[in-house]
Amino acid sequence: MSTMLIAVILLTLLALFFGVLLGFAALKFKVEGNPIVDELEAILPQTQCGQCGYPGCRPYAEAIANGDKVNKCPPGGTATMEKLASLMGVEPEPLNAEAQSQVKKVAYIREDECIGCTKCIQACPVDAIIGAGKLMHTVLTADCTGCDLCVEPCPVDCIDMIPVGQNLKNWNWRLNAIPVTLIQETPHEEKRG
């Protein structure tokens, strides 16, 4: 047998052995997550914006599971808060007062001042900023959640948070806010004649 063939067979057997060893270790030392936290995290909008006071949606879900309030997620809105309250078996509360008083804002990059450092792109949790290194960047306003995380890393301070007023182009129905009464039909008794 040639030396090359022996080396290939030996490396293949080593790779197979270590693969089986890693697979066994993954099963043996598996850490079970909290299923309630997983369900809560699935309900949250996954913007990782930090407006709730936690660094992301997973830490906020863990805090809710440990008894924190369910009304701290402005991007999720009332619908998300009601789903969280239903899952946790608590009464829905109005959204956090700070979140309600704020007008929706989106990031705006003054493109003539942008140096293309990409720090804002790296900071954006929803990939709402596009651009390339050494070229100007711009914000996709439809995707921007207004989390404000892109402002601080900008070395030339060319990002502003601009309030967005509602107009005919960006207004949409808040269907969950419309009160609806469900009426159940009762079977009518047959009239005897």
UniProtKB/Swiss-Prot annotation:
It is an enzyme of class 7 (translocase). GO terms for biological process: electron transport chain. Its EC number is 7.-.-.-. InterPro entries: 4Fe-4S_dom (IPR007202), 4Fe4S_Fe-S-bd (IPR017896), 4Fe4S_Fe_S_CS (IPR017900), Elect_transpt_cplx_RnfB/RsxB (IPR010207), RnfB/RsxB_Proteobac (IPR016463), RnfB_subfamily (IPR050294). It is found in: Cell inner membrane. It comes from the Bacteria. Residues 105-134, 136-164 form the 4Fe-4S ferredoxin-type domain. Gene3D superfamilies: 3.30.70.20, Electron transport complex subunit B, putative Fe-S cluster. Pfam families: Fer4_21 (PF14697), FeS (PF04060). [4Fe-4S] cluster 3 binds at C124, C144, C147, C150. Residues 32-90 form the 4Fe-4S domain. Binds 3 [4Fe-4S] clusters. NCBIfam families: PRK05113.1, rnfB. The complex is composed of six subunits: RnfA, RnfB, RnfC, RnfD, RnfE and RnfG. PANTHER family: ION-TRANSLOCATING OXIDOREDUCTASE COMPLEX SUBUNIT B, OXIDOREDUCTASE. Part of a membrane-bound complex that couples electron transfer with translocation of ions across the membrane. This is Ion-translocating oxidoreductase complex subunit B. The gene is rnfB.
